[in-house]
Amino acid sequence: MADKPDMGEIASFDKAKLKKTETQEKNTLPTKETIEQEKRSEIS
């Protein structure tokens, strides 16, 4: 099968070439209090 990965390439991969990135939370879920406030404001 030609679609199998080249294990030699994986074994010789240098992790030092990877760049270190800082991950940031982008879409945080709202708290229960925030959801309740929004529900109350929609009703009134």
UniProtKB/Swiss-Prot annotation:
Residues 1-25, 33-44 have a biased composition (Basic and acidic residues). Residues 1-44 are annotated as: Disordered. Signal peptide: none annotated. Keywords: Acetylation, Actin-binding, Cytoplasm, Cytoskeleton, Phosphoprotein. One of its GO terms (biological process) is actin cytoskeleton organization. It is found in: Cytoplasm, Cytoskeleton. The modification Phosphothreonine is found at T21, T23, T34. It comes from the Eukaryota. The modification N6-acetyllysine is found at K4, K15, K39. Its main location: cytoplasm. GO terms for cellular component: cytoplasm; cytoskeleton. Gene3D superfamilies: Single helix bin (1.20.5.520). Transmembrane segments: none annotated. One of its GO terms (molecular function) is actin monomer binding. The modification N-acetylalanine is found at A2. The modification Phosphoserine is found at S12, S41. Belongs to the thymosin beta family. Plays an important role in the organization of the cytoskeleton. Binds to and sequesters actin monomers (G actin) and therefore inhibits actin polymerization. This is Thymosin beta-10. It comes from Rattus norvegicus. The gene is Tmsb10.
